[in-house]
């Protein structure tokens, strides 16, 4: 399913209450049928909604960093070498890496969602493994 709307205000109120929302990638078709939405898409759409939320005086409410966690330390130039992390990927890099086969399969929509997030207000996107979160290492996607 596609994401048509994210209620950033509801998420904002949960955050103000000290809660950490956990958002499942489930949507509905408006006719009572549940749909499984790509988790990367759901994360990207949520990040975009929060990045564009404004305070009462018109300022942006959040500086958003989106982190995609998976089993590798980042996007790899060589899938068999965990030390081959590509440090940064922008639009031009992405197309070149797709064309030469470095990026394929499930990594392609992940980076497409990451680029869309950055293009729509998200400060940066990091693709990494959970153990690297403290140091914020991995592949940074964006401009």
Which residues are covered by each model-predicted region?
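C-terminal catalytic "cap/lid" subdomain
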Residues: 1-143
């Amino acid at each position: 399913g596609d994401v048509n709307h994210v209620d950033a205000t509801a998420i904002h109120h949960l955050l103000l209450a000290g809660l950490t929302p956990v958002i499942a990638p489930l949507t509905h078709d408006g006719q009572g049928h549940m749909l499984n939405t790509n988790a990367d898409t759901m994360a990207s759409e949520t990040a975009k909604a929060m990045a564009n939320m404004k305070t009462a005086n018109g300022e942006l409410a959040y500086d958003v960093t989106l982190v995609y966690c998976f089993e590798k330390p980042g996007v790899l130039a060589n899938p068999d070498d965990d030390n081959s992390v590509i440090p940064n990927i922008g639009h031009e890099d992405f197309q070149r890496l797709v064309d030469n086969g470095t990026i394929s399969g499930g990594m392609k929509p992940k980076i497409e969602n990451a680029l869309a997030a950055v293009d729509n207000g998200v400060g940066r996107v990091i693709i990494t493994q959970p153990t690297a979160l403290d140091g914020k290492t991995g592949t940074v996607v964006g401009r």
